[in-house]
Amino acid sequence: MAGQPDRRINLAVARVIPVVLFGIIIYSCYVITKPLCIDYLIDPLPKYNRPSRVGAGAAILVVFYILLLFVIITYVRLLYTVVYNPDLLPRSQAADQQSTPAKRSKSRSRRKGHGHGHRKSKSDEVSDKPVSDVERALDYNAGPMVLPWDTAGLEYFYKKDVFVCQPDGRPIYCSKCCHYKPDRTHHCREVDRCVRKMDHFCPWVGGVVSETSFKFFIQFVFYTALFCMTVLIVCAIYTAELRQDVSLISGSRNMLIISRLVMLTLIGLSDSLQLAAFNLTTIENLNRRSAVWTLAIRVPNHMISRIQPGTRWAPTFRTITYPLPPVPPPLSGMPTQPATGEGDNPYSPPPVPSTDPSAEQHIFAILQTLPGENPFALGSPLKNLQQVLGHSIIDWLLPIKRSPCADHSSAESEFVMGPVVSRLKKEAGLESKDAAAGSITTKHKNSSYNSSPSAPADKRSKRKQKRGKHHHHHHHHRHSSTTGTT
């Protein structure tokens, strides 16, 4: 019961904090421009008794407002993406059908409680609220539509070559949204939706930081850090000059307090740079040293006959074949077909797809990484950063294009896979024919290269053959001349 108010509070704070940040920026602009640059450096007030320093004041203003411009641009781009393109996955109809009766029952219980002074006992609250493990699709007391009845929605996954799966080979399932989740997708409690490559819910930027906004979040952190460091250095320099003037200590202290508060905030936010260098999200980083990823990796066509039952070659891995066969009929007591005239039953299973034996089959090997391995790490921090920030300097500095990792059009996998997946394929013998042919060609070239020391022997054999031909030709000439003389 406490989750709903907390969610509303977090959303309300996420809408208020951006306004507060803009207020802090406006106040810092006033402090740097009027009291420091104009009244102290460019046109000093009589009480300072100091000469005019127009160059220093102008330089500070130029650097300050250039950095401020980048801060505002990146922040506006970030806010727009977080609000209008957070990359949320749509909820399934089954989830909406489950949530509607639950909301009605909660509203009725509230009205009864307010009207008659009845308060729910603790046991009632526990029985009404399902005990769930959202990430593992375990949702007890969640109703008959917690798991799918057919293979609807699985085609998106088994058309890829690699995807993250459960131990049984099916994709990760969200029991709250009632659908399968693409790789690195997590359910956000604040928005009650699944988010692609969710990093964290950040009230400072107004919502969820995900794959569509993580790049702009890093750029905003970077320019804000430069901006705050500039303000901090300027304030430190001129505070040292004004240290003996008691009337100016309070103003300089205010500037230092603001700068230090913002810097302390940025220290926590700058961790995202480290996460991007390791190609991790904040959620994945929680157990990155012990996490074990289960992957479904496509078995190449030339190996399918070898893993069939009755063959001599015994695979060292479990497999799963898509499309999945029809599920067994539901348990007794669970409605399966709507009654005549009652319309659609929200608890009836969808129609079971037809299983044509001639239909194309997709066989996947179920493999697991070692603890602490990251299948999405590309082998170097630069390659990992390029997946978030882009492949050019302009992409790194300007918040224009989206991250390359937000493009999921590849037929290989949802995200670019690293050396860990290549090693798993090699250990399981799942390399494709092209890769095997490439390795054979490489070996052939290497063997030719390694056999180069025997080249002199080849030359000697060629010389022998040449001498043999010359000797045969000379003998034939002598024989013909002798015959002519005779």
From Swiss-Prot:
Its EC number is 2.3.1.225. The DHHC domain is required for palmitoyltransferase activity. It catalyses: L-cysteinyl-[protein] + hexadecanoyl-CoA = S-hexadecanoyl-L-cysteinyl-[protein] + CoA. This is Palmitoyltransferase pfa5. Residues 172-222 form the DHHC domain. GO terms for molecular function: protein-cysteine S-palmitoyltransferase activity. The chain crosses the membrane at residues 12-32, 54-74, 217-237, 261-281. It comes from Emericella nidulans (strain FGSC A4 / ATCC 38163 / CBS 112.46 / NRRL 194 / M139) (Aspergillus nidulans). InterPro entries: Palmitoyltrfase_DHHC, PFA4/ZDH16/20/ERF2-like. Its main location: membrane. Belongs to the DHHC palmitoyltransferase family. PFA5 subfamily. Residues 103-121, 460-480 have a biased composition (Basic residues). GO terms for cellular component: endoplasmic reticulum; Golgi apparatus; membrane.
